Regions:
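Substrate-binding groove of N-acetylhexosamine-processing glycoside hydrolases
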Residues: 3-5, 43-55, 59, 79-402
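Short, solvent-exposed turn/loop segments enriched in Gly/Ser/Thr/Pro and often Arg
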Residues: 10-17, 65-69, 114, 214-217
Length: 402
């Protein structure tokens, strides 16, 4: 009942740039990251992929991907076959791959967006309410459709999307997410706002299965352990009728050996300009203020406009992270890394503005202090931060794999 089933998630249409860039893949390439449908070589390749899945996993379930193939049929396919509606291509491609799954006794699912975007003229979430899908191309009944949404905090959007999915399939799964792809630090306020709205609607629509994704877009810079508050929230809402933070905190402690409030403090890194408001727009100043060249000051305007004292703001976070690191042995490396990040940001976030201000005032003493003390201090903290991140990564990988 409470076992863990490892389900492989692969790609059998798009998001295959790293594979398709090689000359040996020329025959099955439609465009840079999309397989060419309706070629026997393509399905021979996919069958080999699925045979490997069958051989190496105990489950018979498999996620086939197939999302975001926006240029489907518009590359080599177009040159060789002429234009064909994307909705027909995706249906026929799905049917071929599902046939392979049946042959191998696998139960497939795919991301649902191509069945919506290929059947309409808008984006995935752009369809109006009460959209009639009766004339759309639809998947086979044994192909699961996974509706993915990590962005909306209003139940109305989820209701609209689930109404559309109900017209396409009786086999609908929902995928939300724990936002560890915001930058260097997690975005829990967006995770919680979206997940509460999503899962309450899924219950209303009697959706039997939900997934918590933890994507690693934009560099995979956030430590994986930071996904835990989002993951525990999914479990909490699955087992309880309503959200109860008191119960959630106890569940978090029981399941992770961590303190909920300590983890939630990580949300502050990107709340610099929000004044305690939720980070629903996924701002990530902790990333761009870390990486920006202080002599260019591309993002200095945001700091000036907000009138925020970045030094004291990140110094307070540094103190908080230091205390969190002391309290827990299991996550000491995680909070130590964020302590070092806060130390870097406390001096670097406004470095360019400090240099410019001192230069405009002809304040040689201030410039000398920045040159001889502040910048070397930042470099030292950066070195410590890098070492801490590498140590955290090393320890977590050893714990999982060795």
């Amino acid at each position: 009942m409470f076992g863990v089933e490892l389900v492989p998630c692969i790609q059998t249409l798009a998001h295959l740039h790293n594979a398709l860039k090689w000359p040996g893949m020329d025959k099955i390439r439609d465009s840079a990251d999309i397989l060419q449908p309706e070629k026997e070589e393509t399905y021979q390749f996919i069958e080999k992929l699925l045979s490997s899945v069958k051989e190496n996993f105990s489950t018979n379930r498999v996620h086939l991907g197939m999302d975001e193939a926006v240029m489907l049929g518009l590359g080599n396919y177009l040159k060789e076959n002429g234009y064909k509606k994307g909705s027909l291509i995706i249906r026929e491609h799905c049917n071929r791959v599902v046939d392979i799954c049946r042959k191998l006794e696998l139960k497939p699912m795919i991301w649902s967006d191509m069945y919506i975007t290929a059947n309409s003229t808008g984006g995935y979430y752009d369809l109006p309410e009460n959209t009639d899908c009766s004339k759309w191309e639809k998947p086979k009944k044994d192909l699961g459709l996974v509706y993915w949404d990590y962005y909306h905090d209003d139940t109305r959007t989820y209701e609209k999307m689930l109404d559309i999915h109900a017209q396409l399939s009786d086999n609908v799964i929902f995928a939300g997410g724990s936002w560890i792809w915001n930058g260097i630090s997690p975005n829990y306020s967006k995770t919680y706002a979206c997940t509460k709205a999503a899962l309450s609607t899924c219950k209303k629509y009697n959706i039997k299965e939900v997934l918590c994704t933890a994507w690693m877009d934009n560099g995979a810079e956030t430590p994986v352990d930071a996904l835990l508050p989002g993951l525990v929230l999914f479990a909490h809402l699955d087992f309880h009728g309503d959200y109860d933070e008191t119960i959630l905190k106890q569940e978090f402690r029981n399941c992770t050996d961590g303190e909920f409030d300590d983890f939630m403090a990580l949300d502050n890194f990107d709340s610099l300009f929000l004044n305690t408001k939720e980070n629903k727009e996924a701002q990530n100043p902790s990333k761009y203020l870390l990486y920006q060249d202080p002599m260019l000051g591309i993002f200095d305007y945001h700091v000036k406009e907000a009138g925020v004292n970045t030094k004291s703001y990140y110094q307070n976070i540094q103190k908080c992270m230091k205390e969190c690191a002391k309290k827990t042995g299991k996550y000491q490396l995680l909070f130590s890394f964020y302590e070092k990040l806060a130390a870097v940001l406390s001096d670097k976030a406004d470095l360019g503005m400090c240099i410019k201000s001192a230069y405009d005032r002809s304040d040689r003493a201030a410039l000398k202090d920045i040159s001889q003390n502040v910048i070397p201090g930042i470099i030292c903290n950066l070195t410590d931060m890098k070492s801490s991140r590498e140590k955290n990564l090393d320890e977590r990988c050893k714990a999982i794999w060795l």
